[in-house]
């Protein structure tokens, strides 16, 4: 008897990718929140139009609320598994302007303030963290409340 190829009867989980310029802060936080809040029923990804390095204060801000993004790396949009992405969310204006047209994918823009820019004149990391925490919490609210609705419709 010939062996049959295994065919999954389960559709893949929907995927959401967050895009910003450097893939260092906001998009990384959003990916971390999605994986933390919705990993049972969604896949999370992030990328940048001009990737740099992971922002250490973004890592710290997420760690404060029990979300570990320390193993994340900055990636280019070309590295996204587009066959697994259903919704692409740009989280900064530059990424929105540079976002390529992706046939068959829903693309929305939800901008968030840039913590490194806001914290540029901070006198210490502790002072800078005030900006990172605010943006972190705004991203959490968006990911928790809006992303499931956006995927449905």
Residue positions per predicted region:
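Phosphate-binding/catalytic loops
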Residues: 8, 96-153
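Alpha-helix C-terminal capping/helix-to-coil transition sites in glycosyltransferase folds
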Residues: 82-84
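Short glycine-rich anion-binding loops that position phosphate/pyrophosphate groups of nucleotides
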Residues: 24, 93-96
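Conserved active-site segments centered on acidic
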Residues: 2-79
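Residues at the C-termini of beta-strands that transition into short coil/loop
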Residues: 48, 92, 111-113
């Amino acid at each position: 008897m010939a062996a049959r190829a295994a065919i999954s009867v389960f559709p893949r989980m929907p995927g959401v990718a967050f895009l910003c310029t450097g893939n260092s802060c906001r998009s990384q936080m959003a990916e971390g929140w999605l994986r933390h809040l919705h990993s049972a029923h969604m896949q999370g990804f992030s990328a940048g139009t001009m990737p740099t390095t992971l922002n250490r204060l973004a890592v710290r801000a997420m760690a404060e609320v029990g979300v570990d993004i320390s193993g994340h790396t900055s990636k280019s949009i070309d590295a996204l598994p587009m066959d697994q992405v259903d919704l692409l969310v740009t989280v900064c204006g530059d990424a929105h302007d540079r976002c390529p047209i992706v046939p068959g994918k829903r693309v929305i823009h939800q901008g968030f303030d840039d913590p490194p820019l806001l914290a540029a004149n901070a006198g210490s990391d502790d002072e800078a963290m005030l900006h990172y925490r605010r943006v972190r919490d705004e991203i959490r609210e968006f990911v928790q409340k809006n992303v499931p609705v956006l995927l449905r419709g």
